[in-house]
Amino acid sequence: MIHRTLHWLAAFAALLPVPSIAAAKNVTRLAPVTPWHVDWTDTSCTLARGFGEKADPDLLRFEQFGQGLQLQMLMTSNALRFLEQSDRPTIVYSVTDTGPEFEQKLPRALLGSLPNKKVTLFIPQSLLFPDDPVNAVAADVQITQIGVTDRGHVVVFDAGSLEKPFEAMRSCMDDLIKTWGLDPQKLRQLSRWPVPKSPPAKWLRSNDYPDRELELGKQGLVAFRLMVDEAGKPTDCLIQRSYSDKVFDKITCEKLLARAKFEPALDQVGNPVTAYYAEEVSWVTE
């Protein structure tokens, strides 16, 4: 089947004093060995830092594909070897070991590897910045470490303050949006973003899965951006990041352009305007 990964599937819990990292017995701690680095491409902005061994660092990376709170997160470390694809690990965002924390339960462990061959855990929709940030104001100021736990193991990335790195990330995102022909400041003032007319989970169907990839058990994770015009029609599909065979990219854009329909974005006074819709889809077999 196709599992559509959407940000509203994962519940957000407010920062609460539940120090599970401090109570854990089997903990691997990864200290930073490089500064944070922001990288700008023509499709996304990334924020990454090396941890562990300086000669061969593990990686904590965030990637953003549009304005707002959605982030893709990636962890690479052979300390994650205890994870299996069938697991449902928990991501823990915390303020030191004994301070407040909140958890994000993943529906599955999306595992892979980067060119360095280390175990890689993909988190398509990190809840570092929740959709309703009322109970977690300025999360990038508060959170100092990010961990993953399952099977009695905990791996902790001692990230430090994220305030300045994410300031740079937001500046990068503004510059990227300008290359799409849009004004980031005007987008912030929208009274409404494009609203899907039908559930996005229905835009891609089980019978869209490519036959060969299904037979081989191949899976994919695709981040896309649709430009949506004043009439609510998708006019362009851009693959912003893909951990997949190209066939998944092709099918994703073809089907979305054919099936996705929107109520258009509205400016401050309610006039329809062009904007974009950015999301991610996981192609998985079960």
Show the residue positions of the predicted features.
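Bacterial N-terminal signal peptides
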Residues: 9-17
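Internal interaction segment
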Residues: 101-203
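An ectodomain-focused feature that recognizes extracytoplasmic/extracellular
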Residues: 23-85
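Residue-level signal for well-ordered, solvent-exposed loop/turn and beta-edge residues enriched
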Residues: 37, 231-233, 238, 271
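Extended low-complexity, serine/threonine- and proline-enriched intrinsically disordered segments
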Residues: 74-110
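Short proline/glycine- and basic residue-enriched helix-capping loop/turn segments at helix->loop/beta transitions
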Residues: 188-227, 250-286
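A short acidic/small-residue loop/turn micro-motif
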Residues: 211, 241-247
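Bacterial N-terminal signal peptides that target proteins for export
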Residues: 1-9
